[in-house]
Design a protein with these regions (language model features):
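Active-site-proximal alpha-helix that buttresses catalytic centers in soluble enzyme cores
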Residues: 7-86, 92, 128-132, 136
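Domain-level recognition of soluble alpha/beta enzyme cores
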Residues: 126-155
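Short glycine/proline-enriched coil/turn segments at helix->beta-strand junctions
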Residues: 53-54, 78-81, 104-108, 126-128, ...
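Short, flexible helix/strand-to-coil boundary loops that buttress conserved ligand/catalytic motifs
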Residues: 26, 101, 122-125, 151
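Non-DNA-binding regulatory cores of transcription-related proteins
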Residues: 103-111, 115-135
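Mid-chain, well-packed structural core segment of small domains
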Residues: 78, 84-116
Length: 155
């Protein structure tokens, strides 16, 4: 895939934050994970450790639920890198994510974010429309645009 005159290579791990508390009280950005969401994210981390090597870089939304999702996944990964926690990803569109990916060719990159961006990036890279539930993880080969694996907490 070519983005801004860069050929995307490497692997993309797209993570939609796990199940979050309802937004009835307080600000959306501050919503944390439910106990079920924390358990699903930890399970996703154990699964991910069997599928991809240690990530080279991680871009994580600064929303509490996204940070907590990464914190539950990371302990299962070998030599997990510190994430770049960025408020910009909270409102980022697919183009922003693809631009970020273009910055490190050949890397295994993890993006922990929100819908609709996660589904839109997955569709842009693979050419297939697919629903991504809270806590789901997609692993994509960027050079071919092929979906290599998909984990759904409700499988």
């Amino acid at each position: 895939m070519v983005v801004m005159n860069h050929v995307l290579t490497g692997s993309l791990v797209l993570v939609r934050h796990a199940k979050a508390e309802s937004g009835e009280e307080g600000e959306d950005h501050a919503r944390g994970l439910t106990s079920r969401g924390r358990a699903a994210a930890a399970e996703a981390g154990r699964w991910l450790a069997t599928v991809v090597p240690a990530p080279d870089r991680v871009w994580c939304s600064s929303a509490a639920r996204a940070v907590q999702t990464w914190e539950a996944i990371a302990p299962s990964l070998p030599a997990a890198v510190a994430p770049v926690v960025d408020r910009a990803l909270y409102l980022a569109g697919p183009h922003d994510v693809l631009q970020w990916l273009a910055g490190s060719p050949g890397a295994t990159s993890v993006v922990v974010g929100h819908n609709p961006t996660v589904e839109q990036v997955l569709g842009s890279v693979t050419g297939e429309l697919r629903g991504v539930r809270p806590g789901a993880v997609a692993v994509v080969d960027l050079a071919s645009g092929r979906l290599l694996d998909f984990w759904d907490p409700q499988r």
